[in-house]
Regions:
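Short runs of predominantly hydrophobic/aromatic residues within well-ordered alpha helices
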Residues: 22-25, 73, 113, 185
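A glycine/threonine-rich phosphate-anchoring loop and its flanking beta-alpha core
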Residues: 1-41, 131-138
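A generic structural signal for short coil/turn motifs at secondary-structure boundaries
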Residues: 15-18, 86, 201
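C-terminal charged capping/lid subdomain of soluble metabolic enzymes
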Residues: 132, 136-208
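Active-site segments that bind and position negatively charged phosphate/pyrophosphate groups
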Residues: 35-158
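Alpha-helical architecture
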Residues: 7, 25, 32, 93, ...
Length: 208
């Protein structure tokens, strides 16, 4: 889909329910971070993605706390658009997982992305440490003195901290029963691995 116009009017989304605000916000953050670490990324997509990360870091907690905050809503709309513009190189494993559990378990797409994002970042940390270090700094982490892998881990930790601060689940078991997860486990793995976006992963050759 390639729209001709994007209407970024914060007054249109002030009534968005809190859980939708949280889920769509995490989807936007996932777009941004996956664009930054994608091996096919370029200076334009990386720059757009990092700016989106910075804006979401600052604005998402504000819109969750006060949905009528027009400045924060506006910043989230702009950040989401920047993340969309950065998607040219492709997405990543968090989206593969979200597509699958959305279909099999009915999990909101953005929520599925958010749950998978920190794990996907850690999975790729050795092969994307430099880009993930940039994400860490965009999330407000002071990375001076850290190794690349330490900075990558700090980026994932910062994302998890944001999720907890806004009331977003960090584990699928928080919103789906263990029984349903186990019943669908093989399909979840197969669906995630067969998603066309899995090819964007840096460590695909190391997957079991």
């Amino acid at each position: 889909l390639c729209p001709n116009v994007a209407i970024l009017d914060p007054t249109l989304v002030t009534g968005l329910p809190r859980h939708i605000t949280i889920g769509t916000g995490m989807d936007a953050l996932t777009h941004a971070i996956e664009s930054v670490v994608n091996p096919s990324g370029n200076p334009i997509t990386v720059g757009l993605g990092l700016q989106a990360v910075r804006m979401i870091r600052d604005s998402l907690p504000r819109v969750v706390a006060d949905g009528s905050d027009l400045c924060a809503r506006q910043d989230m709309l702009v950040a989401s658009t920047l993340g969309g513009l950065a998607l040219g190189p492709g997405l990543g494993m968090a989206h593969c997982y979200a597509h699958t559990i959305g279909m099999l378990l009915g999990v909101h797409h953005g929520t599925g992305c958010g749950i998978a994002l920190p794990a996907a970042m850690r999975f790729n940390r050795e092969h994307a440490s430099a880009r993930l270090a940039e994400v860490a700094r965009a999330m407000g982490v002071e990375t001076a003195g850290m190794s690349g892998v330490e900075a990558a881990d700090a980026a994932a930790d910062a994302v998890e901290a944001l999720m907890k601060a806004i009331g977003h689940p960090t584990r699928i078991s928080e919103i789906v029963t263990q029984e349903r997860i186990l019943e669908n486990f093989e399909q979840i793995v197969a669906g995630t691995m067969s998603d066309e976006r899995t090819g964007d992963q840096l460590r695909l050759e190391h997957l079991p």
